[in-house]
UniProtKB/Swiss-Prot annotation:
Entry's localization field: Cytoplasm
Quaternary structure (record): A double ring-shaped homohexamer of HslV is capped on each side by a ring-shaped HslU homohexamer. The assembly of the HslU/HslV complex is dependent on binding of ATP.
UniProt function note: Protease subunit of a proteasome-like degradation complex believed to be a general protein degrading machinery.
MF terms (GO), sorted A to Z: metal ion binding; threonine-type endopeptidase activity
Catalytic activity, EC: 3.4.25.2
Organism: Lacticaseibacillus paracasei (strain ATCC 334 / BCRC 17002 / CCUG 31169 / CIP 107868 / KCTC 3260 / NRRL B-441)
Catalytic activity: ATP-dependent cleavage of peptide bonds with broad specificity
Gene3D superfamilies referenced in this protein's UniProt entry, alphabetically: Glutamine Phosphoribosylpyrophosphate, subunit 1, domain 1
Name of this protein: ATP-dependent protease subunit HslV
Stored NCBIfam families: ATP_dep_HslV, PRK05456.1
Highest taxon above the source species: Bacteria
Length: 174
């Protein structure tokens, strides 16, 4: 359980995520996990929500796709989604990812879908709906805020509401 939020504005994209890892639904195991990270020669940023082991498995599969498709984010995401739908091991994974590079911002869902958001905002995890609503409002009504500021504040707002999200927020931008 976590909150990951991405915002694209004026050619800049930012991805923010909190650091809380919860065991079951009662115990906070860690508060400073890094769920947003740069991969593929620092050219791609991913953020993941769901089971930790499942998220790492997805990251590994996605990195292999990026290597195979020479860093083409969209093609790699679609190939991962196709495998996700077909592979019995991947079908059991309980995780989602937001992936981005300088050109694309995509949600890769647990059902094997690749979604390019309409609103230039996408959020996942237990606090995802709170963060997405907050980010859309800031994007529309706070013109002086940067994408990084909006993404971070959206995760912090979710952290005020969602017990599975904390305020130890990491942000990466392109």
């Amino acid at each position: 359980m976590t909150t990951i939020a991405a915002v694209r504005k004026d050619g800049v994209t930012a991805l923010a995520g909190d650091g809380q890892v919860t065991l079951g639904e009662k115990v906070i195991m860690k508060g400073n996990a890094q769920k947003v990270r740069r991969i593929y020669h620092d050219q791609v940023v991913i953020g993941f929500a769901g089971g930790v082991a499942d998220a790492f498995t997805l990251q590994d599969w996605f990195e292999k796709k990026l290597e195979h498709y020479a860093g083409n984010l969209r093609r790699s995401a679609v190939a991962l989604a196709q495998d996700w739908r077909k592979d019995p091991t991947l079908q059991k994974l309980e995780a989602m990812m937001i992936v981005m590079d300088e050109h694309d911002l995509l949600l890769v869902s647990g059902s094997g879908e690749v979604i390019d958001p309409d609103e230039d905002v996408v959020a996942i995890g237990s606090g995802g709906n709170f963060a997405q609503a907050a980010a859309i409002a800031m994007l529309r009504h706070a013109p002086d805020m940067t994408p990084a500021d909006i993404a971070k504040e959206a995760v912090n707002i979710a952290g005020n509401i969602d017990i599975f999200t904390n305020h130890n927020v990491i942000v990466e931008s392109f």
